[in-house]
């Protein structure tokens, strides 16, 4: 056996020797990489051990004997061994299905500089410890799960951890690494690190040890935040790729001051305000944001450029791979000079500025409130005008303002000067305003605005409630009574909200404050109100608590105005955050023990809950550090608690109000119901009893003399909008009974669509009829007894006009569940004959329904509008969430692009019954996605890909009867689908869109479809034999050319009577043919 194996392997050795003799010079100079399979290297190792003994185990270079060998095999072995010793680049590949019989040894490679391992098990690799100190690049793919098994243990050598002195490039992409480890400390000279396509969730602190890093690729992982880097690598990193992760912010990139390429595409960035850290990246050249939710914003590029550094955008900047256009450049923020730039201004520049200022007799007015940005805003010297000399008023500056003359000081002296000016400025405020110097703006405006200021004197506290228990008190308006009546609190808020803009002081140039605010907006990404706001209480010194940790070291001032809770920086008085009071939902107070100034004591804690979407703004927690924290907290609570109660009252009013819609102009508005309008069932009750119908409501309103009219067009034809958003998924009917409202104009025919599963209906307060922007007019009824005006004694044939709507309600047994029927609005082209029925049982809410309602998950609108003429654009407009799902999970080829889609009920040949699906067409394929659940939430939860076919494989297209369906047949593999579109205009437009896609294919891939037939009702149609022969004969004798198919519907399940409705003809049969 061994002899046979050696004989079979001899051609391998001789062939490799001849190959290296011909092209070995490319391998020796490093321009080509020697690629070997693991079995080949194992055989070469055995040959070397057989003919050359143990000399291949030596660590250094081995010199071969100079005398000629006896056989050709020994000569070839000596040649190959000599070549491997001088090889600089090696690529070692292991076939996964081939089991390794022994270890893979790389001892012969003495001069190795570049090593690449593909699917090689690390524990089977031997000899890495002899070459690790000279390797310059290392690539491992599909073979490692941790870094330390290669970097620390050197594979199967299991050696001690030593530094890799020359290693500059590490590529560990396409592995199963879940976490980093301390082995990265051994890579002192690393410049390029690629860990893409792994399973890393958090880099923690391990990347901080890489001091020379210039390129970092962590794409296609599960990171939720930007990785932390060391101080040295922060200034050296040039490229950061974080594509396809789970980032919801880019906080941390502002420290990468020399970054040139940033890729955060396909993450979870929601708002453009989260891009504020980009303003400090002055050398950024490439920015990729595609695939994020903010990328789908219609003004994405202009909203992004607001946060990009103007210095970076002015030099060949690429946003999402495209250069900036002239319209994009208009949205760039103005370059605001910073304090550091003003300090670094050269002495010669400042001398020229002073000389020009003196020559033009235009001395600058340096006042107390002048910002540092203003001092450098006039860098360019003015040209002397030839016109009249303007007479200027002299401005007398404060003694502290004369310090601007010493501008030619060194950098350290400039910092001292800035600090000295700030101190003198504070002293002047103290002298002018006394103990209330921190509120100098409010004191200057006291003539215009009445200020609410509360103190803790004994006289004022007589009319207040008892002191607040700060241990576990929670200000929830549902449980706590109002502390201040609306009469006491409302004037203060109205006065504060109606304040006028204060006059600008003579010594305060308004331009400086605006430039400072623009700079703050650029840094924070938040819009600051230029109009000053009046404080409703004294500013409170607090420290913010993040999560459940200790308070932050930076203290801030907490200001409360009529509209905002403002966080102000303690040192520079810069606004950090503005939180709107109208979003304040709840206030909580508690206590915590904290050590301050070597004194451990109990401090009160204030927690504010807001209704923001952003997580970091939903809850703000502060520890009060003022001199009298309890008194300050009490003052804040007296101001904020009426606001919370007012917010809850507004929410209750919105719930009690009725959402109405005008039938004439479709304007939507809110209307508060009077007691005479609410009927016997108040809106507060959680029962499913409904309000009266629109006719009864208008009759009552007319009787009271107060008709409900549209505020836009003054029309009194209004309807009640549904309070709950119903699912767009069809729901199968139950047998409990139905209640309908059918008319000549609204009925379109019908078969019932059955969805994949029954959708639970949310509780409804009233019966509603809705004409909306979608494809249906809906009338909902819930279980209640009929009013006398709408009793069963009326005629069963129901008609409707444009002026009034009469709803027919069936009688309900006690405890019987009711249903509502939703009919599609008739197509404007008049071609739709089959309606889209939706049934949903109206019953009490279950726990799962309540949780679904509380989560407020967004529903999906996947149906094109039928209130206007359809066109191709209706099928191409897709929700960005669905498009992202198609790109990531459905499309099978990289160059596929979405073209159109259609939500339709489908019947597949070979499968029993119909099913709801979404038909998606790209530029190459057609995909059938089955709807498996409620259309709500993530697409992966309710979509399943069934089939996919190439557009070029379409072999037959056929339009169904009356253009209500479309049949498609495919080849390779053979399949047939019948799309039950049930709308003539929708069918025709979708067929036209599909035909256009087929024509856009290359000529060699064009479809084989030559013509598209349309099914007609004739004796060859399969419905023809189903007609009654007697009726056919009698009709022919009477000379009738057409027959009409009538539809009958059971009014009640247990009732024997049948109700006939006037319908349009469903089938027309021409007997003359």
From Swiss-Prot:
Keyword RNA-binding carried by entry: no
Biased composition range(s): Acidic residues: 515-532
Biased composition (Polar residues): 779-788, 843-859
UniProt subcellular location: Cytoplasm
LRR-type repeats, residues: 166-187, 189-210, 212-233, 236-257, 258-279, 283-304
Record keywords, A-Z: Cytoplasm, Leucine-rich repeat, Repeat
A Gene Ontology BP annotation from the UniProt entry: protein localization
Regions crossing the membrane: none
Pfam families assigned to the protein according to its UniProt record, in alphabetical order: LIP1, PH_PLEKHM2, PH_S11IP
Chain intervals for the UniProt region annotation (Disordered): 389-409, 455-533, 724-817, 834-859
Coiled coil: none
Example of a GO cellular component annotation carried by this entry: cytoplasm
Family: Belongs to the STK11IP family.
Protein name as it appears in the record: Serine/threonine-protein kinase 11-interacting protein
The organism of origin for this protein: Gallus gallus (Chicken)
Gene name per UniProt: STK11IP
């Amino acid at each position: 056996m061994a002899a046979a194996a050696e004989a079979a392997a001899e051609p391998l050795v001789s062939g490799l020797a001849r190959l290296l003799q011909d092209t070995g010079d490319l391998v020796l100079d490093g321009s080509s990489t020697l690629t070997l399979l693991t079995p080949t290297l194992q055989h070469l190792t055995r040959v070397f051990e057989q003919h050359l003994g143990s000399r291949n185990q030596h660590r250094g270079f081995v010199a071969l004997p100079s005398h000629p060998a006896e056989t050709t095999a020994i000569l070839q072995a000596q040649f190959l061994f000599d070549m491997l010793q001088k090889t600089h680049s090696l690529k070692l590949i292991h076939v996964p299905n081939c089991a390794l019989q022994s270890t893979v040894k790389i001892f012969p490679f003495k001069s190795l500089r570049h090593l690449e391992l593909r699917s090689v098990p690390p524990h089977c690799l031997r000899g890495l410890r002899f070459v690790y100190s000279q390797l310059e690049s290392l690539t491992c793919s599909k073979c490692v799960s941790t870094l330390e098994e290669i970097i620390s243990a050197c594979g199967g050598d299991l050696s001690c951890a030593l530094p890799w002195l020359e290693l500059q490039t590490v590529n560990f992409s396409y592995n199963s690494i879940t976490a980093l480890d301390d082995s990265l400390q051994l890579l002192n000279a690393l410049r390029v690190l690629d860990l893409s396509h792994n399973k890393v969730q958090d880099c923690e602190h391990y990347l901080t040890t890489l001091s020379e890093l210039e390129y970092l690729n962590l794409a296609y992982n599960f990171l939720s935040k930007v990785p932390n880097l060391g101080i040295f690598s922060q200034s050296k990193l040039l490229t950061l790729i974080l594509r396809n992760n789970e980032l919801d912010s880019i906080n941390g990139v502002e420290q990468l001051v020399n970054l040139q390429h940033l890729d955060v595409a396909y993450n979870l960035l929601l708002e453009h305000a989260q891009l504020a850290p980009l303003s400090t990246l002055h050398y950024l050249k490439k920015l990729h944001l595609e695939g994020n939710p903010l990328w789908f914003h219609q003004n994405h590029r202009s909203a992004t450029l607001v946060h990009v550094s103007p210095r970076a955008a002015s030099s060949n900047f690429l946003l999402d791979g495209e250069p900036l256009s002239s319209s994009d450049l208009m949205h760039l923020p103005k370059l605001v000079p910073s304090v550091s730039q003003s300090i670094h201004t050269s002495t010669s520049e400042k001398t020229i500025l002073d000389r020009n200022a003196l020559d033009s007799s235009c001395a600058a007015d340096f006042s107390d409130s002048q910002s540092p940005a203003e001092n450098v805003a006039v860098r360019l010297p003015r040209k002397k005008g030839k016109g009249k000399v303007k007479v200027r008023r002299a401005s007398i500056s404060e003694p502290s303002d004369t310090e601007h003359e010493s501008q030619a000081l060194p950098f350290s002296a400039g910092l001292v000067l800035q600090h000295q000016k700030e101190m003198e400025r504070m002293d002047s405020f103290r002298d002018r305003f006394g103990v209330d110097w921190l509120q100098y703006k409010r004191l200057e405006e006291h003539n215009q605005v009445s200020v609410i200021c509360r103190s803790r004197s004994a006289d004022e506290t007589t009319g207040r409630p008892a002191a607040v228990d700060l241990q576990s008190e929670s200000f929830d308006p549902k449980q706590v009574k109002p502390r201040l009546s609306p009469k006491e609190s409302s004037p203060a808020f109205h006065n504060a909200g109606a304040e006028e803009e204060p006059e600008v002081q003579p010594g305060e140039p308004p331009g400086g404050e605006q430039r400072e605010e623009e700079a703050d907006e650029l840094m924070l990404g938040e819009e600051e109100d230029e109009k000053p706001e009046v404080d409703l209480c004294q500013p409170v010194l607090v420290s913010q608590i993040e999560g459940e940790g200790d308070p932050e070291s930076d203290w801030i001032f907490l200001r409360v105005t009529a509209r905002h809770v403002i966080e102000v920086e303690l040192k520079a008085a810069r606004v950090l955050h503005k939180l709107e009071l109208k979003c304040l939902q709840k206030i909580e107070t508690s206590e915590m023990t904290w050590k301050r100034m070597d004194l451990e004591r109990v401090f009160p804690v204030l927690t504010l809950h807001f209704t923001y979407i952003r997580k970091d703004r939903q809850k703000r927690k502060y520890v009060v550090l003022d001199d009298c924290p309890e008194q300050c907290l009490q003052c804040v609570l007296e101001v904020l608690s009426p606001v919370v109660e007012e917010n809850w009252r507004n929410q209750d009013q919105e719930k009690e109000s009725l959402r109405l819609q005008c039938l004439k102009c479709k304007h939507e508005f809110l209307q508060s119901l009077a007691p005479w309008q609410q009927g016997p069932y108040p809106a507060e009750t959680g029962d499913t009893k409904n309000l009266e119908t629109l006719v009864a409501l208008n009759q009552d309103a007319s009787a009271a003399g107060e008709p409900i009219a549209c505020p836009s067009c003054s029309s009194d034809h209004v309807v009640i909008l549904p309070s709950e958003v119903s699912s767009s998924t069809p729901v199968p009917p139950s047998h409990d009974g139905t209640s309908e409202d059918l008319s000549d104009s609204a009925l379109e025919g019908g078969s019932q669509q059955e969805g994949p599963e029954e959708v639970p209906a949310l509780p409804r307060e009233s019966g509603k009829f809705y004409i909306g922007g979608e494809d249906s007019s809906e009338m909902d009824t819930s279980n209640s007894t009929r009013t006398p005006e709408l009793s069963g004694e009326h005629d069963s044939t129901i008609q409707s006009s444009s002026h009034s709507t009469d709803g027919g309600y069936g009688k309900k047994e006690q405890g019987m569940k009711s249903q509502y029927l939703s009919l599609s609005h008739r197509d404007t082209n008049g071609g739709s004959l089959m309606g889209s029925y939706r049934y949903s049982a109206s019953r009490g809410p279950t726990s799962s329904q309540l949780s679904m309602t509380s989560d407020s998950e967004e529903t999906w609108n996947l149906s094109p509008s039928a209130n206007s003429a359809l066109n191709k654009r209706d099928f191409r407009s897709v929700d960005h969430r669905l498009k992202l799902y198609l790109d990531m999970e459905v499309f099978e080829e990289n160059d596929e692009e979405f073209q159109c889609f259609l939500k339709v009920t489908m019947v597949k040949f070979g499968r029993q019954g119909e099913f709801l699906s979404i038909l998606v067409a790209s530029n190459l394929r057609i995909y059938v996605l089955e709807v498996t659940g409620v259309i709500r939430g993530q697409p992966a939860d309710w979509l399943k890909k069934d089939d996919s076919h190439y557009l070029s494989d379409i072999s037959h297209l056929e339009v169904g009867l009356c253009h209500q369906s479309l049949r498609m047949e495919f080849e390779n593999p053979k399949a047939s689908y019948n799309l039950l579109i049930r709308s003539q205009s929708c069918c025709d437009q979708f067929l036209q869109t599909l035909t256009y896609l087929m024509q856009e294919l290359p000529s060699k891939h064009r479809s084989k479809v030559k013509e598209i037939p349309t099914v007609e009702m004739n004796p060859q149609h399969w419905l023809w034999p189903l007609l009654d022969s007697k009726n056919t004969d009698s009709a022919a004798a009477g000379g009738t050319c057409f027959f009409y198919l009538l539809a009958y519907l059971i009014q009640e399940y247990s009732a024997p009577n049948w109700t006939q409705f006037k319908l349009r003809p469903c089938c027309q049969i021409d007997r003359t043919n």
